[in-house]
Regions:
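Acetyl-CoA-dependent GNAT
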Residues: 54-113, 185-188
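A short, well-structured alpha-helix characteristic of acyl/acetyltransferase catalytic modules
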Residues: 2-61, 188-196
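Active-site acidic-Proline motif in GNAT/NAT acetyltransferases
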Residues: 111-113, 117, 133, 146-147
Length: 196
């Protein structure tokens, strides 16, 4: 799984290899991949205001600079083709707290052709293994729009448990949306891994 590391601006990023997906650090050459989906209303329908439209090349450059700058509180990976390393989307651990042993995960599988094939679930599995086994975290959490049933199912299959609903929490596309909080604990994840 962990095959090598790449030095970032302020930290070393691992490269995580799966059968059907590769998690690698961002590169400057990923900008066209980012820009290829960020103005697609279907791809961004359930994402935070970071990807509100119109999404300009400058927005993409700013996001890429943020991803490349790294830091001890975040690790941002590109989900890529395991052979060509072509950009498919992104997955991250953000707000990493070594003291609390927690982090938040964010996932975007950018193109429809890659969805529904288990790629997101495999990427989550790679990231969770790294978070729990290598970083020593004890809890990984996320939030997801309640109506995003495809993502919620993916997260449930990856071992996340729904912990609660914040009603009418986020404004997006002209209305307020309920947001579901989900999390997985290291012990729960380890038990699932043993049974797999």
């Amino acid at each position: 799984m962990l095959s090598q590391t790449t030095k970032g601006a302020t930290h070393t990023m691992p490269i995580l290899r799966g059968k059907n997906v590769l998690l690698r650090p961002y590169r400057r050459s990923d900008l066209p991949g980012i820009l290829s989906w960020t103005n697609d209303t279907e791809a961004t329908r359930y994402l935070t205001e970071i990807f509100d439209q119109p999404y300009t090349e400058k927005n993409g450059e700013d996001f890429l600079n943020y991803a490349l700058s790294g830091g001890s509180e975040r690790m941002m990976f590109v989900m890529a083709d395991p052979v060509t390393e072509e950009y498919w989307g992104q997955i991250s651990l953000e707000h990493i707290s070594r003291r609390d042993g927690t982090a938040e995960v964010g996932v975007v599988l950018a193109k429809e052709e890659h969805r529904g094939k288990g790629i997101g679930r495999e990427a989550l599995s790679l990231l969770l293994r790294y978070a729990f086994d290598s970083l020593g975290l004890r809890r990984v959490e996320l939030t997801v729009f309640a109506e995003n049933s495809r993502a919620r199912l993916c997260y449930l299959k990856a071992g996340f448990i729904e912990e609660g609903v914040a009603r009418q929490k986020t404004w997006k596309n002209g209305k307020f949306h309920d947001v579901v909080s989900m999390a997985v604990l290291r012990d729960e994840w380890a038990k699932r891994e043993e049974q797999a």
